[in-house]
From Swiss-Prot:
Superkingdom to which the source organism belongs: Bacteria
Classification via Pfam families: Ribosomal_L9_C, Ribosomal_L9_N
Residue ranges the record marks as coiled coil: none
Natural source organism: Dinoroseobacter shibae (strain DSM 16493 / NCIMB 14021 / DFL 12)
GO biological process: translation
Official protein name in the record: Large ribosomal subunit protein bL9
GO molecular function annotations of the record: rRNA binding; structural constituent of ribosome
Family under the similarity heading: Belongs to the bacterial ribosomal protein bL9 family.
Highest classification ranks of the organism: Bacteria, Pseudomonadati, Pseudomonadota, Alphaproteobacteria, Rhodobacterales
Length: 209
């Protein structure tokens, strides 16, 4: 099926090009999204008549996207999720979650603008690709953590493995301190108990003139 592109489409072509695509791709994506028209003679003539207007609109939207990309690129957004001690999520983080996290921080993103090779299923920092315009992209970072405190530590560069090791070491230290306290208390108690040797010493001292 032939269509005429109304904007640049990655791996397909530039605005104004007539390209061959699969009918399903055209009907389910290109046509309803307003990215292309059926390449009939009437539509091609209509495009040529409106080409200058379409190019001006594309230039305007690209400038807006570039301005947003400057602010958005490299930004980090926190996503709180439940996870196991090993860092595996109970569920996953999707394109919708990424868009909602960015939007909550003041950036208007749609899930269709977010690209994930696969759903995120573990804690940590994850770089996510965002398409703001056919010619403008940005990368954001999702900080997936179990709490705001954990997210802050991850942002400082600590991995979930390092955080788990620190928590384990702290727990072992607290247990060791507890046993030390118990040992000290037991030693103090033993000093208060009178032994046969203590009584014999006291009796010998009493018998002395």
């Amino acid at each position: 099926m032939q269509v005429i592109l109304l904007e640049r489409v990655a791996k397909l072509g530039q605005m104004g090009e007539v390209v061959d695509v699969k009918p399903g791709y055209a009907r389910n994506y290109l046509l309803p999204q307003g990215k292309a028209l059926n390449a009939s003679e009437a539509n091609i003539a209509q495009f040529e008549a409106q080409k200058a207007q379409l190019e001006a609109r594309n230039l305007e939207t690209r400038k807006e996207a570039e301005a947003m990309a400057e602010k958005l690129d490299g930004q980090q957004f926190i996503v709180i999720r439940s996870a196991s001690d090993a860092g595996a999520l109970y569920g996953s983080v999707t394109t919708r979650d990424a868009a909602e996290a960015a939007t909550a921080d003041g950036f208007s993103l749609d899930r269709k603008q977010v690209s994930l090779s696969r759903p995120i299923k573990e804690l940590g920092l994850h770089t996510v690709h965002v398409t703001l315009h056919p010619e403008v992209t940005a990368d954001i970072v999702l900080n997936v953590a179990r709490s705001a405190e954990e997210a802050e530590l991850q942002a400082s560069g600590k991995s979930i493995q390092e955080l788990a090791a620190e928590a384990e070491a702290e727990a072992e230290f607290e247990i060791a301190e507890l046993f030390d306290d118990i040992g000290s208390a037991a030693s103090e108690d033993s000093d208060l108990v009178e032994t046969p040797e203590d009584r014999a010493t006291e009796e010998a001292e009493d018998e002395q003139p």
